[in-house]
């Protein structure tokens, strides 16, 4: 393979390259480094391809300019077109093919930041030209325009070293994790228009601190053509979306969150990409980033194309992209979207529309290997960054380590729990006793994976109704049901995720084209009280380690009564690491008050109320114990030697502990 000097057709040129944040100093690329970089890229082992692929401002032979490099294995010719040459195909801007595996490169002097450009790629036969944005561009035009924009990864003064050091040393399994999922374009707006990353930081950080969430999860922030895709059908995997600003704007937001002890997760989509003609689709007129076989490449259900996860150069593209967000933007983890679509060859396909693997099964062996390698890389190089799988099936070993034969994710969304419990709370309480298993079944498999309990954006859109509107009954019953559901969720083992707007009971579904209905908090007392309830519940969660310190250990949870279907009541104990930290949850899913309700308790002593979802301050009717003390008796009940009798609020949760 040619070295970097041959790549420029210069024997003695001095190459300096300013890439990423290197304290503002130029870095000289040696012959060995350049050879290693391209070899690893072509082998599917490169984890920082963005440092040499794409467009980089460098000095070559004492001339300042931009080095363009791309991968296009079947192209017969590639021109760089842009503002600087009137978008014309000129021979002097024809890229040089530097190896037979499809690496193309060209240095153009005297280019400045802000110049728009594309690659004009002629196909293998030379009879068709496609105009493509740069897959590795750091900036793209604001939609509907589609060109890439020359920009530098400028130095940024981070102030989150303490946060990152703590992240690397401490895991999250035995820590609180209460995630606020949000879409940056519709959380809040300014005069109906998008806010910048910096403007968002001024209000979001204070709101998250006020509400007591530990993490935020951003829906995708890479460039995407269609607002309605929410970022999940991407084009510019390395471009921070121009809707809200630039790279340093996003870094400012993340830095401020970290300095206020708030973690940042990012939704990431290595499964599929959009078919817009300026993007990755048929990059050189033939399958490049997608599978060669059309049935495997085409994702008809989503109108997208699936990445070829077995192709080395595509793997380098995606591995590098994952590390780009972790290294350059300090994100604390990636929530990997649509994992089921990756794992199954027959996902979304009917009989006859797919072919089995070499073992006659439906598992995508290339995707399985890709995910294992991805998680291994992040565990090794991510300095404590985590990965979360959005996976909706019963595939085994999602969060089991790669060494033990698993995929190696840190956490998995518990879609089963979400589907079961949401279908239950929509039922009239008269019929709930016939579906009691929907609320207790999750504990049958709870310790098979490390789960996050998600109420995500997908559940409050496209006719599914807002979370408050999923609740049964009139307005009072809906808000009581919401408080009950949220407290049951907080008591259930597993980390938590709640989508924006649910925390104040927004009635309308989420709409990506407008901000949340913040005005209702001021206009209607029940919305204000609902927000205060979530704030208090989050605080209660943070202050009680029994709710998170043993999420993934069986000794952290014990049923008091899992089978009271007739009265639709669930009662259980959450236990902390020191075993003395115990909280008793009694959840009543009917609108009836239960007087002198008997439950078994683990020890003889005095029990006091520490949380009640029916408090007047939260919009309830006030069926609370207050300062009353309940003395346990030696009368056994169920599997316990002792018992107490309590008043359980309607559509409410009562939480007790030993005084």
UniProtKB/Swiss-Prot annotation:
InterPro entries: A-amylase/branching_C, Branching_enzy, GlgB, GlgB_N_E_set_prok, Glyco_hydro_13_cat_dom, Glyco_hydro_13_N, Glyco_hydro_b, Glycoside_hydrolase_SF. Its EC number is 2.4.1.18. Pathway: Glycan biosynthesis; glycogen biosynthesis. The keyword Hydrolase does not apply. Residues 1-26 are annotated as: Disordered. The keyword Transferase applies. GO terms for molecular function: 1,4-alpha-glucan branching enzyme activity; cation binding; hydrolase activity, hydrolyzing O-glycosyl compounds. It catalyses: Transfers a segment of a (1->4)-alpha-D-glucan chain to a primary hydroxy group in a similar glucan chain. It holds the Pfam family Alpha-amylase. Belongs to the glycosyl hydrolase 13 family. GlgB subfamily. HAMAP family: GlgB (MF_00685). This is 1,4-alpha-glucan branching enzyme GlgB 2.
